[in-house]
C-alpha cells in the first residue's frame, strides 16, 4: 500500500478482506483445492524427485485458490464500489504482474486479466457465484 493515498486505501482493504473471506468460504464449503464439477486434471508431470512433483502440485492448487479469491475480491468491488473497480483492478494487476516465478502460487494473472472491466461478473446473487464462472474460464486457460 506504499504510495497509495490514504483516501484510496479503503477499497483496496475491502478487496483484500474479500479475498481472504473467499479462502474461508472455499474451505467451509469443503472444496479447498478442489476443481469445480466437470473439471479434471489432465496430463502427467514427471520428475526424478517426488518432492518436486508434490511442490508443483501444491503450487498449482494454490494458484487456483488464489485466482478464485482474487476474482471474489474483484466481484465484491464491482458490486460494492463500481466507481473504484478500474483502480482496484489496476492495483491487483500490478501486484500480480510482479510475480517472481511464473505459474507459482500467486501467479493469478490469467484470472485478473479475464476480469479487466468487471462486466463478466454479471448479476449473480453473491460475489462467490459471480467469481465462479470467470474462475472456470481461467482454469481452462491456465493449465
Regions found by a protein language model. Give the residues of each.
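Long, well-structured alpha-helical subdomains associated
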Residues: 55-56, 60-62, 71-143
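Catalytic Zn2+-binding segment of zinc metalloproteases
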Residues: 20-37, 68, 75-76, 81
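A structural signal for well-ordered alpha-helical segments within the folded catalytic domains
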Residues: 11-19, 63-74
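Active-site scaffold of zinc-dependent metalloenzymes
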Residues: 1-14, 21, 27
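Post-HEXXH active-site segment of zinc metalloproteases
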Residues: 27-66
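Residue-identity detector for glutamine
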Residues: 8-9, 29, 48, 78, ...
